[in-house]
Amino acid sequence: PIVRCYAHGFDDPGCSYNRAYASALSGWNQIRPHLPVMVLEYYNVSKFEDLPLLFTHSMAHDFQVYRRTGAAGFVYMHVPLVNWGMRTLTQVLFAELAWDPDADIAKIKAEFLSRRYGAYAGRLRSVYDQIDMASQQITSWRAWKDRSLLSRLQSWNGGRPERPLQVDDHFQTPEAFDTAGEQMLSLLQAALLTLRETLSAVKHDTAAIRTDIVTAVNPAQQRSAQQSAQLRHALEEDLRLLVYGTDTMQLMLRMGQYYTALYAGCDDRAA
């Protein structure tokens, strides 16, 4: 389902993106003699451009649907090669749910955060939750379909538009797009602030541990130094990815707002 919607369940009949996919999967699995059908998801489709997206909100439900409709297997594109950052959670959930669709997502997520961030897991939970919420309408923003905002903007020549900004039926109007975009950006900026503050706290709390110049004299010191280095690496990787994601989504939002301002003749706002 390369242009599926993640704001709604895969089997939601009210979703204009998903209902055709759900119908197709159900139809294929009713063919006799039965043919094994696999699902190819797109948690990192090329149009997402390695953005720091999370799909925890939809994965538990969707894997249940895939099993219920008779899917014989599950893969997805494209598994990131480097700089997984917070997307590491998606890899963990994918592996766990592909093995057991009934797996406890809340438990898996809590264990993941604890192992990755240790004493700072509580802070990062809010970061992950905010990114997850901000990711829900990503298909309306950028997808392999001409009704996504990215496709609309890419076909625009930059001059004064002759018609209002076209948005999909999930946004419905340019005004609703504007509101949803500001909410999305607010979530990402809040997550970014928490992440920066957490990294600063980690640097302060571990200032005495200088693994580059101090040699551990016992196993406890060695473990402490390794854990400190791993934690900072994880947070710095998360930060790089989230800065990129926030900047990218802000640029898309502002371009959409610029289009609307030009169309309305509000040159002062467009400037």
Q: What is each residue range found by the language model?
A:
Residues P1-K109, R115-R116, E182-L185, Q189, ...:
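Catalytic-core regions of glycoside hydrolase
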Residues E41, T69-G70, E96-A271:
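Catalytic domains of carbohydrate-active enzymes that cleave complex glycans
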